[in-house]
């Protein structure tokens, strides 16, 4: 497990900024419980600093996981967020969409968010911005990218796509064989 290089840090922060914006400072500058970003087998982990120091005594081949897995780097060098990062993203989300109970199951089965399923949404969502999808009782269900801005979404047909799904908590069951390998 090693620290991220300057280039890797830039790529990770750009991806995170798409979902949490300037709130990324809360991840980095937490005085009460400082956290660090670590890389292990192309996966980026968000780890409390004191735990990362303890992990230095474990050999790399023996270390499976540590902290919260935010995502992984692809072979082409791009960073892809993982569903396990949802707890971090939801806490500091900039743009949010709440879906009605009748839209939860279709979303958890891997479908996009439709206009008919939207209960409420943030007022200032631009087009193609990262959004966090919540149930009406504020339980985070996943994240994606907005298909239209908030003002355009209000005038859509009920079958129109409001947000493209990128990850949802249903992946824990659908991809349980390959999720942590």
UniProtKB/Swiss-Prot annotation:
GO terms for molecular function: RNA binding. It is found in: Cytoplasm; Nucleus, Nucleolus. It holds the Pfam family UPF0113. GO terms for biological process: assembly of large subunit precursor of preribosome; maturation of LSU-rRNA from tricistronic rRNA transcript (SSU-rRNA, 5.8S rRNA, LSU-rRNA); ribosomal large subunit biogenesis. The keyword RNA-binding applies. The keyword Nucleus applies. GO terms for cellular component: cytoplasm; nucleolus; nucleus; preribosome, large subunit precursor. Residues 94-170 form the PUA domain. Keywords: Cytoplasm, Nucleus, Ribosome biogenesis, RNA-binding. SMART domains: PUA (SM00359). InterPro entries: NIP7_N, Nip7_N_euk, PUA, PUA-like_sf, PUA_sf, Ribosomal_synth_fac_NIP7, UPF0113_PUA. Required for proper 27S pre-rRNA processing and 60S ribosome subunit assembly. Present with 5170 molecules/cell in log phase SD medium. Interacts with NOP8 and RRP43. Interacts with pre-ribosome complex. May bind to RNA. Belongs to the NIP7 family. This is 60S ribosome subunit biogenesis protein NIP7.
């Amino acid at each position: 497990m090693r620290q991220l290089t300057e280039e890797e840090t830039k790529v990770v922060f750009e991806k995170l900024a798409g979902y949490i914006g300037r709130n990324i400072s809360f991840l980095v500058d937490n005085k009460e419980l400082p956290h660090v970003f670590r890389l292990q087998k192309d996966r980026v982990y968000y780890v409390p600093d004191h735990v990362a120091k303890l992990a230095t005594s474990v050999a790399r081949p023996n270390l499976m996981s540590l902290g919260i897995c935010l995502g992984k780097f692809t072979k082409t060098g791009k960073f892809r967020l993982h569903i396990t990062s949802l707890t971090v993203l939801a806490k500091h989300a900039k743009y949010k969409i709440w879906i009605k109970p009748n839209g939860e199951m279709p979303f958890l089965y891997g479908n996009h968010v439709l206009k008919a399923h939207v209960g409420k949404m943030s007022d200032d969502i631009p087009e193609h911005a990262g959004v966090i999808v919540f149930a009406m009782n504020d339980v985070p269900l996943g994240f994606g990218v907005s298909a239209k801005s908030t003002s355009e979404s209000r005038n859509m047909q009920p079958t129109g796509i409001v947000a493209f799904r990128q990850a949802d908590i249903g992946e824990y069951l659908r991809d349980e064989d390959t999720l942590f390998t």
